[in-house]
C-alpha cells in the first residue's frame, strides 16, 4: 500500500505545479469523490509543469494507480496517454499500454484508444507490419461504434500517418480528410494546419483513383495556405477540380518546383484530362450530353486520335457511363460519377436548375394557352 497522503503532502511543498492543485487532489481523494477527482487529474496532467521530466510517471505510480479501478475506463486511458509520453523507452511504454488495455477491456472506446496508442508507438519505431495489423483490428471495432466518438480522430490520425509513411497517397488522402472531419480546425496550430493542407493537396493530386477534390477545397484548412508561398497548390487543386488542363499547364512554373509532382507529370496530365471529360459531361444538360471528338480534344489538349482512348479509360474506371459513336466521332454520356462540388460548380448547377424551371414554366404556359385546341 502506497503512502498517498504522504506523497500528496510532499508534492504540495516541493512538487511541480501549484500547491493549491495538489491540495485539491488530496481533498477529493480523501472524500472519495472519484468523478470530480478524475476530472481534476485529466486537467492536471495537461499542465505545462509536466512538460519536462518524469513527474507524470511519479504521479501515476504514487497516486493514480491507487484509485485507477474507480476511474471511467476511457478517462483512464486519456490520462495514461499523457503518462506514456514521459517514458523514454518505447518497449516500457508498450508494456504499460498492454497492461492498461487489460484493465479497461470493459469499454470498447477505451480499448480502441489504447490500441491506437500502441499502433502509434509501433509506427514510431518502424514496425510497419504490426501497425498495419493494429489499424485493421481497430477499424473493425470502430465500425461497430454508434456515430463519431472522441476516439475516431486519434485513429484517423494514426492511419493517415501510416499511409503517408508507406506512400499510399489515396488512402492517406481519405483518412487525413476523415481526421479533419473529427476535429475543430481551430484547435490545430496554424503551422500544423498548413502542413496538413499541403500534404493533403499533394496526396489528392498524386493519389490513384482520387477524383474528388471538392471536400478538401471546401475545408477551411486549405485557407491556411492562401497568400503564402504555397498558394499555387490551391490554384492547382481548383484547376484539377474543374478539369482545366490549360490552367494546369500555365501553373507548371509553380507545381513543377515540387519534386513529387514534377516526377509524376505524365500521371497528373492523364488525371486532369479525365477530370476535364467529367466536367464537360457534368456541365451539359442531361438531355444534351453529346460530345464531339473535336470538343473533347480541344478541352483536354489532346489530338482527335487520342479521344477514344481517353473516353475508354474514363468508362473503364467508372467515372462516366455512355457510348462511343466511332462513325460520327461522338460520345453520348448518360451518367457522371457524383462528386463534392465547389461553390462555382454549385452555382453552375443552380443556373441549370433555373433554366430547367423556366423551360417547365414555358411548357406550362403553352399547354394552358392551347388547352382548348388540345381538348377539342
From Swiss-Prot:
Q: Which UniProt keywords apply?
A: Acetylation, Proteasome
Q: Which GO terms describe its cellular component?
A: cytosol; extracellular region; ficolin-1-rich granule lumen; membrane; nucleoplasm; nucleus; proteasome accessory complex; proteasome complex
**Which BP terms in the Gene Ontology apply to this protein?**
meiosis I; proteasome-mediated ubiquitin-dependent protein catabolic process; ubiquitin-dependent protein catabolic process
Supply one GO molecular-function term. structural molecule activity
Residues carrying N6-acetyllysine: 298
Domain named PCI: residues: 171-338
Superkingdom: Eukaryota
**SMART domains assigned:** PINT
Q: How does it assemble?
A: Component of the 19S proteasome regulatory particle complex. The 26S proteasome consists of a 20S core particle (CP) and two 19S regulatory subunits (RP). The regulatory particle is made of a lid composed of 9 subunits including PSMD13, a base containing 6 ATPases and few additional components.
Described by its record, this protein's role is as follows: Component of the 26S proteasome, a multiprotein complex involved in the ATP-dependent degradation of ubiquitinated proteins. This complex plays a key role in the maintenance of protein homeostasis by removing misfolded or damaged proteins, which could impair cellular functions, and by removing proteins whose functions are no longer required. Therefore, the proteasome participates in numerous cellular processes, including cell cycle progression, apoptosis, or DNA damage repair.
Family membership: Belongs to the proteasome subunit S11 family.
Query: What protein name does the entry list?
Result: 26S proteasome non-ATPase regulatory subunit 13
Q: Which organism is it from?
A: Homo sapiens
Amino acid at each position: 500500500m502506497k503512502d498517498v497522503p504522504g506523497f500528496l503532502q510532499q508534492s504540495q511543498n516541493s512538487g511541480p505545479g501549484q500547491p493549491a492543485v495538489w491540495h485539491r487532489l488530496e481533498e477529493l481523494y480523501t472524500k472519495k469523490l472519484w468523478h470530480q477527482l478524475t476530472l481534476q487529474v485529466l486537467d492536471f496532467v495537461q499542465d505545462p509543469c509536466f512538460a519536462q521530466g518524469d513527474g507524470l510517471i511519479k504521479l501515476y505510480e504514487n497516486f493514480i494507480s491507487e484509485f485507477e479501478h474507480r476511474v471511467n475506463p476511457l478517462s483512464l486511458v486519456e490520462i495514461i496517454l499523457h503518462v506514456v509520453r514521459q517514458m523514454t523507452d518505447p518497449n516500457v511504454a508498450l508494456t504499460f499500454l498492454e497492461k492498461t488495455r487489460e484493465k479497461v477491456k470493459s469499454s470498447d472506446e477505451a480499448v480502441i484508444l489504447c490500441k491506437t496508442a500502441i499502433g502509434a508507438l509501433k509506427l514510431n519505431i518502424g514496425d510497419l507490419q504490426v501497425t498495419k495489423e493494429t489499424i485493421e483490428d481497430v477499424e473493425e471495432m470502430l465500425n461497430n461504434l454508434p456515430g463519431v466518438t472522441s476516439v475516431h480522430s486519434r485513429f484517423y490520425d494514426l492511419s493517415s500517418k501510416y499511409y503517408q509513411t508507406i506512400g499510399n497517397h489515396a488512402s492517406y488522402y481519405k483518412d487525413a480528410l476523415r481526421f479533419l472531419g473529427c476535429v475543430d480546425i481551430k484547435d490545430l496550430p496554424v503551422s500544423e494546419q498548413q502542413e496538413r493542407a499541403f500534404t493533403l493537396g499533394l496526396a489528392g493530386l498524386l493519389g490513384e483513383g482520387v477524383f474528388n477534390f471538392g471536400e478538401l477545397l471546401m475545408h477551411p484548412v486549405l485557407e491556411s495556405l492562401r497568400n503564402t508561398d504555397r498558394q499555387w497548390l490551391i490554384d492547382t487543386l481548383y484547376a484539377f477540380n474543374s478539369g482545366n488542363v490549360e490552367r494546369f499547364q500555365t501553373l507548371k512554373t509553380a507545381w513543377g518546383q515540387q519534386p513529387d509532382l514534377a516526377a509524376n507529370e505524365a500521371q497528373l496530365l492523364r488525371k486532369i484530362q479525365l477530370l476535364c471529360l467529367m466536367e464537360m459531361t457534368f456541365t451539359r444538360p442531361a438531355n444534351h450530353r453529346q460530345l464531339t471528338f473535336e470538343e473533347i480534344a480541344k478541352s483536354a489538349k489532346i489530338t482527335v486520335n487520342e479521344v477514344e482512348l481517353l473516353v475508354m479509360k474514363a468508362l473503364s474506371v467508372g467515372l462516366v457511363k455512355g457510348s462511343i459513336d466511332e462513325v460520327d466521332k461522338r460520345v453520348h454520356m448518360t451518367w457522371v460519377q457524383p462528386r463534392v462540388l465547389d461553390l462555382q460548380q454549385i452555382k453552375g448547377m443552380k443556373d441549370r436548375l433555373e433554366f430547367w424551371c423556366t423551360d417547365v414554366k414555358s411548357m406550362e404556359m403553352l399547354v394552358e394557352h392551347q388547352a382548348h385546341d388540345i381538348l377539342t
